[in-house]
Amino acid sequence: MIIAVDVDGGDYAPKEIIKGALKAAQEYKIGLILLGKKEVIHVHAGHYLKKLPIEIVHCPQTVTFNEHAVEAIKGKPQSAIVIGTSLVKQGKADAFISAGNTGAVLAAAFFILGKIDGVERPALGAIITTRPHIPSLLIDAGANAECRPNHLDEFAHLGNIYAKQVLGLENPRIGLLNNGEEEAKGTKLTLETHQLLKKSKLNFIGNIEGHDISLNKADVIVTDGFTGNIVLKTLEGLGDALLKVRKVGHAIDSAAHLRGRALLADVGLGSMVKGMDFEECGGACLLGVKGTIIVAHGRSHARAIKNAIGLAKRTAEKGVDKLIAEDIKSRTKAGTEGDPKNVNTPV
């Protein structure tokens, strides 16, 4: 297993990216291709370059966060984002991760890897854990701001396969994020999407509201990318706020040990904070393209990068992109939606 890593992208690049990548190489026993300025990588990786299976690919160009995605990809062919995606296309890397310009990463994936046949809109699937050890998938988490009902229906099918393979769920519960549980409530988009999902062979449980996310009512939360990204950022902000509250509580109780209910409350809060910490998962997977692409958070530190690489490894090992292609072929061949349970996707 070889993972290509963009060491130029992110608020804390290259030091934290390289640090996280080295930890991943040691923990997951994988090979790495580090993409960036060769001399900089040598400075931060040091003697690990001789101890670990690491290859360096010099990338003289860098895509910044404020650049237009398509223009950056076309104008900077020697950037880590373009070269890393190309390595996946060529079969020289099993996956590529970047904490850089998200739009540029998506554009590179679309233009270089291409969409899986039958997929109209690839989407970002982000794993969220609002309850200890009970993950769910939010899709779309930011790739498509404007969507049609058939796009959300497509997201549900993409998320269903990912939840089976990566989250290990046998029959994922699919929920449509809406402003009410009632079938007759919502916008034109959610009303029409509801009918499509209702007719599907997915385990569609109906509409879910915002508060249902933290209660883990659904395993796959389906929404458009604009709403999904706001939800994701809100959860991240809440996690940061809870962490600050917990730190203040520890400072107040520094003179005495927590006991009884106070201790239980602290443990519970700690579990919740950990679950809502974006660094726990590491990144979001771009589903619907021919290859494994993980988009890490721009403010990722070493732990987030290590975990993003772990996610890339699990996703690539499961061959999620190939299973998505099989699922589409199966449903197309049937001439109807077909039952995703019949696709050979062992958990």
Curated annotation (Swiss-Prot):
Alphabetical keyword list: Cytoplasm, Lipid biosynthesis, Lipid metabolism, Phospholipid biosynthesis, Phospholipid metabolism, Transferase
GO cellular component, one term: cytoplasm
Annotated metabolic or biological route of this protein: Lipid metabolism; phospholipid metabolism
Catalytic function, reaction form: a fatty acyl-[ACP] + phosphate = an acyl phosphate + holo-[ACP]
Domain of life, source organism: Bacteria
EC numbers, comma separated: 2.3.1.274
Any one Gene Ontology BP term: fatty acid biosynthetic process
Intracellular or extracellular location(s): Cytoplasm
Family annotation (NCBIfam families): plsX (TIGR00182)
Role played: Catalyzes the reversible formation of acyl-phosphate (acyl-PO(4)) from acyl-[acyl-carrier-protein] (acyl-ACP). This enzyme utilizes acyl-ACP as fatty acyl donor, but not acyl-CoA.
Protein name: Phosphate acyltransferase
Encoding gene (name): plsX
